[in-house]
Amino acid sequence: MLNVFTLANGRLFQEEIDSLDELTPARPVWVDLEDPTPEEKGWIAVRFGLVIPADIIDDDLEESARFYEEEGAIHIRSDFLIDDDEAPRNVRVAFILHENVLFSVHREDLPVFRLLRMRARRIPALIEDAKDVLLKLYDADAEYSADTLEGIYDDLEKVSHRVLNSEVNDQAAAGALAAIARQEDLNGRIRRNVMDTRRAVSFMMRARMLNADQFEEARQILRDIDSLDSHTAFLFDKINFLMDATVGFININQNKIIKIFSVASVALLPPTLIASVYGMNFKTMPELDWQFGYPFAIAVMVASVITPFWYFRRKGWLN
């Protein structure tokens, strides 16, 4: 899918392009390619003289391959967060700033992009050129990360009440561990996301491509990211605490089970010993010829079971 965005009356307007003829007269500040076809890439090459490589959004964490200038164009690759309840993930986006037009290439639509499109349509003078689009995307990305962190706070608060304010059985503990693991994964993705945004914005500042107002906006984005770092660190500590508490409750429940088996084994040991003794069946055993030998042995075995249980209960070991 290929969308172009043009400025008119201080607002950003979107137009979906279905052919080269539709693209030719356009004068966009931003061209967004979502999972582009080779044909759409060919239109870009014809209209703007820009060749988009086939591997432009391949994963590569080397900084030299993610931020560079080539033939007058600035190339930036960044990760953007998608907070999906089923599968949160970081999506790679490749930006190319070429002749005052921003080109973005990605495989799926992103919440940050939708947020910017909505704001740019409603707020006049929000965007003046292609570099503003890129900065506003990073600003919206930091804001989206902050909103997602607030969601983690809320979810962990619910887990905390479930773990700390009630009797936790194994099933509840397993559910709590799964919820904690999901939040830990999401928090890690946010931390990776803001780290990547910091590197991209810092590169733009070092490249001397921003005017004074844009440079100040970039500094504000970095300050916002710095504040998010402390929140992600705190959430990691809280997640570790809840994880340890939940595992502790699981250990307590397991110890209760082991305690029951231990008490049962100790209580059943004396009658087993008595039964073993009388099972020897030696001729010299007087109880074999005694009329009440069998009920006597049964009574002794029952008493040997009751006595340990009575003693354990008195000591409070069965509570």
Question: Which residues make up each language-model segment?
Answer:
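Peripheral, non-transmembrane regulatory/ligand-interaction domains of membrane transport proteins
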Residues: 1-206, 210-213, 220-227, 231, ...
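Non-catalytic, surface-exposed connector residues within folded enzymatic/regulatory domains
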Residues: 174, 212-215, 236, 251
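Membrane interface segments of multi-pass transport proteins and intramembrane proteases
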Residues: 208-216, 287, 292
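Hydrophobic alpha-helical transmembrane segments and their immediately adjacent juxtamembrane loops
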Residues: 223-319
